[in-house]
From Swiss-Prot:
This is Neurotoxin B-II. Keywords: Disulfide bond, Hydroxylation, Ion channel impairing toxin, Neurotoxin, Secreted, Toxin, Voltage-gated sodium channel impairing toxin. It comes from Cerebratulus lacteus (Milky ribbon worm). Its main location: secreted. Belongs to the worm B-toxin family.
Length: 55
């Protein structure tokens, strides 16, 4: 992923990384509801990848 986002799209990469970090925090906070976090993360990752490709 970093090869796609690296250099050319630093702002996009940083935003995606923050979203991913938030997702990891969610999994830690809601360990018993991991499915909810996984779905949330998948949406963020997909939208982020689309944005990076378009820009």
């Amino acid at each position: 992923a970093s090869s796609t986002w690296g250099g050319s799209y630093p702002a996009c990469e940083n935003n995606c990384r923050k979203q991913y970090d938030d997702c990891i925090k969610c999994q830690g906070k809601w360990a018993g509801k991991r499915g909810k976090c996984a779905a949330h993360c998948a949406v963020q990752t997909t939208s982020c990848n689309d944005k990076c490709k378009k820009h």
